[in-house]
């Protein structure tokens, strides 16, 4: 009852293609791929940008505890 079989998935895929058309789905897939690619690039740029200033900063002074 709760299982999703291959035939059910094929029927759903056929309905989606009939409703939206192949051109709309192709455009949607391309937009989604570009969004994911842009997100990954932004994450990598953010990581490299965060590491660069820290490496160029002078080391902090060492504090010693005096009793």
Curated annotation (Swiss-Prot):
Record gene name: tatE
Organism: Cronobacter sakazakii (strain ATCC BAA-894) (Enterobacter sakazakii)
Ranges where the record places region Disordered: 44-67
Entry similarity comment: Belongs to the TatA/E family. TatE subfamily.
Membrane protein topology class: Single-pass membrane protein
GO biological process: protein transport by the Tat complex
PANTHER family noted in UniProt: SEC-INDEPENDENT PROTEIN TRANSLOCASE PROTEIN TATA, SEC-INDEPENDENT PROTEIN TRANSLOCASE PROTEIN TATE
One cellular component term from this protein's GO annotations in UniProt: TAT protein transport complex
Spans traversing the lipid bilayer: 4-21
Cellular compartment(s): Cell inner membrane
Biological role: Part of the twin-arginine translocation (Tat) system that transports large folded proteins containing a characteristic twin-arginine motif in their signal peptide across membranes. TatE shares overlapping functions with TatA.
Name used for this protein in its record: Probable Sec-independent protein translocase protein TatE
Principal location listed in the UniProt entry: membrane
Any single Pfam family the record assigns to this protein: TatA_B_E
Keywords: Cell inner membrane, Cell membrane, Membrane, Protein transport, Translocation, Transmembrane, Transmembrane helix, Transport
A GO MF label: protein transmembrane transporter activity
């Amino acid at each position: 009852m709760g299982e999703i079989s291959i035939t059910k998935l094929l029927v759903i895929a056929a309905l989606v293609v009939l409703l939206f058309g192949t051109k709309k789905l192709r455009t949607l897939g391309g937009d989604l791929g570009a969004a994911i690619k842009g997100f990954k690039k932004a994450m990598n740029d953010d990581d490299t940008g965060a590491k660069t200033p820290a490496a160029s900063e002078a080391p902090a002074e060492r504090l010693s505890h005096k009793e």
